[in-house]
A protein has these predicted regions:
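Conserved beta-strand hairpin/beta-sheet module of binuclear metal-dependent hydrolase folds
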Residues: 4-65, 154-157, 161-165, 267
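Metallo-beta-lactamase
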Residues: 5-9, 103-152, 211
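Active-site metal-binding motif and surrounding structural segment of the metallo-beta-lactamase
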Residues: 44, 55-102
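Structural motif
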Residues: 45-47, 75, 137, 161-164, ...
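Active-site neighborhood of phospho(di)ester-bond hydrolases with catalytic His/Asp-centered motifs
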Residues: 49-51, 73-81, 101-104, 163-166, ...
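Active-site-proximal loop/helix segment associated with metal-binding centers of metalloenzymes
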Residues: 148-152, 168-203, 247-251
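FMN-binding flavodoxin-like domain, especially the glycine-rich phosphate-binding loop
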Residues: 175, 186-224, 229-231, 273-289, ...
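Short N-terminal or domain-adjacent regulatory/targeting segments
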Residues: 225-252
Length: 400
């Protein structure tokens, strides 16, 4: 039995949900699964927008067949060639051998690398501003390189004013029946996972996202259909504003992310005491993370949310605690910029981590490391409270 959803009189969702997956891209925890979205548009000609992960090809083709309702497929629009979206292309072509594939020139090259069928005889390479008429619906192709692969484009349907946005505006998480964002009561949970998705999957490519947003600003958009998660038909300015902030590395809130690496609890205590002192200074929505318990993707997402970060690490084998080292290098790799940072180090005989953490932060753009820091020798002493107060004062001042 098929599982398709009618979005408009002519547009159908034919995607799938994956609740068995534990790690997206074999890296990122997805406790609520993933959706792989695909869409069928019916007109005088028919079009399928992207495919799905290879694990779900059978169910996906059932959905496509049901949406086409006895018709053939004229066009396969390939916005993105990452395998969670392109893996079923060969199966679609086998089922609909007359279908033409519309994609960028770079996508043609990638398709030849992934598949063995004759791509050239089927491909229609498109460039910026090219159009394709399906009848009463006209598609315009908008190039979106490095959002987040080089071959990416998005497709705008101008009659119903729908943007097929590839990986942009997506989120972690399967679709739980309610396929439209306005059907979800808990937008806070969605936002948290959307932020984590953006910052970890697309976050490095902020300038490219900014370029796409500028192009999108010139389009009248009534619906956004991403390749992951829910579809947007309301609150589009709110959604786009989030992307404007994230892609420009602008903090959402003037508050603090605290991450600590601790073995026996002494550095953890320092992080907790500092968090309390920051709260006493009127700072709200502080986050505190144990880098050994919380996956880096959650901490990276929170660092994009906040304007200041505190890194508290023990000295471990003469260096930064291993999980803290991973977090710092991941933050650098994801391009986070325009933040204030503060450091706490702990070492029983040779505390070295403030210098080492500072060196990693120094490779990042516009990260201001506060001069006030705290060195713990094994355990905090009562006479160090003034140092924590000074650090809290400096952090609070940076938020003004």
């Amino acid at each position: 039995m098929n599982n398709i959803r009618k979005l408009t009189d002519s547009l159908f969702w034919v995607g799938v949900n994956d609740r068995r997956i534990a790690l997206f891209e074999n890296v990122y925890p997805v406790p609520t699964g993933m959706s792989y979205n695909s869409y069928v548009l019916l007109d005088e000609k028919t079009a399928l927008f992207d495919t799905v992960d290879a694990s779900f090809t059978h169910d996906f083709l059932e959905n496509v067949t049901a949406a086409l309702n006895g018709r053939t497929l004229d066009y396969l629009i390939v916005n993105h060639m990452e395998p969670d979206h392109c893996a079923s292309i060969a199966n679609v072509i086998a089922a609909y051998p007359e279908a033409k594939i519309v994609c960028t020139a770079k996508a043609v090259g990638m398709m030849k690398q992934f598949f063995d069928f004759d791509v050239d005889s089927r491909a229609i390479p498109v460039k910026e501003g090219d159009t394709l008429s399906l009848g009463s619906h006209e598609l315009t192709f908008v190039m979106a390189p490095m959002v987040h692969w080089p071959e990416v484009m998005v497709t705008y349907e101008k009659t119903e004013k729908i943007l097929f946005s590839a990986d942009a505006f997506g989120s972690f998480g399967a679709v739980d029946g309610n396929i439209f964002a306005d059907e979800i009561d808990d937008k806070g949970t969605w936002l948290s996972e959307a932020r984590r998705y953006y910052t970890n999957i697309v976050g490095k490519f902020g300038m490219s996202v900014q370029g796409l947003l500028k192009k999108a600003a010139g389009l009248e958009i009534r619906m956004i259909c991403p390749l992951h998660s829910v579809i947007w038909r309301e609150d589009l300015p709110w959604l786009i504003d989030k992307y404007l902030k994230w892609s420009s590395y602008t903090p959402e809130e003037k508050t603090v992310t605290i991450a600590y690496g601790s073995v026996y609890g002494h550095t953890e205590k320092a992080a907790d005491i500092l968090a309390g002192k920051l709260a006493d200074r009127g700072i709200r929505h502080i986050s505190v993370f144990d880098v050994s318990k919380t996956h880096p993707s959650y901490i990276i997402a929170d660092a994009f949310r906040t304007s200041a970060m505190v890194f508290a690490s023990i000295t471990y084998n003469g260096g930064i605690f291993c999980n803290m080292d991973t977090l710092l290098h991941q933050l650098a790799a994801h391009g986070l910029t325009n933040r204030t940072a503060a450091l706490i180090q702990n070492g029983t005989w040779a505390a070295t981590t403030s210098k080492q953490m500072g060196e990693i932060l120094g490779t990042m753009k516009n990260i201001h490391v506060l001069e006030a820091d705290v060195t713990i020798k094994s355990a905090l002493k009562n006479d160090q409270e003034a140092e924590l107060d000074a650090l809290a004062d400096a952090i609070a001042a940076s938020l003004q």
